[in-house]
Amino acid sequence: SKVNEASKTAETSQETEPPKETEAPEAVNLVLGETASFENFEITVTNFDFTAKAENPQKGKGGALIPSNGETVANIYFDVKYNGKRAISFPFFSCEVVYGDGYTFYSERIWFYDNGVDAWLNTGTIEPLTPKFGSVFSFFVPEEVRDNQENTLSVIFYTSSSTAPIAVYNVR
């Protein structure tokens, strides 16, 4: 019958067509204090600053990383809400700092606040229904990044499962 021939033709053409590539979602521009949602996360950038060392946000607990001469530490502070239904291991996403004409720096230290143990950690698991928690990513960067206010400075967020940026916070 013509109906069967048409369905066979449709099945054959579906099998021979190459799979369509899906475009990565466009990165969300974050503004200080506003929340961006992606995958199973909501993040809110709460602060950005430069410090002399990367240390546990609970001052006096844990060690500190001291940058080399001529470097400083750039810190991005943000709150995270995980909306997933399964536990995931840290790191669940990453960040990089991009300065000027594409100079890129990767995090030296990542901290997140574990509500269950009331402590800042740099490894662990996030369980479903975990309340919102704080995070800090710290980067060693040349002092020029801090001092040269004329060049752009951005923090780009990625999920651990993708190389496409999911969010961008423009510091300047």
Feature roles, as predicted:
Residues S1-R172:
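Conserved functional micro-motifs across diverse proteins
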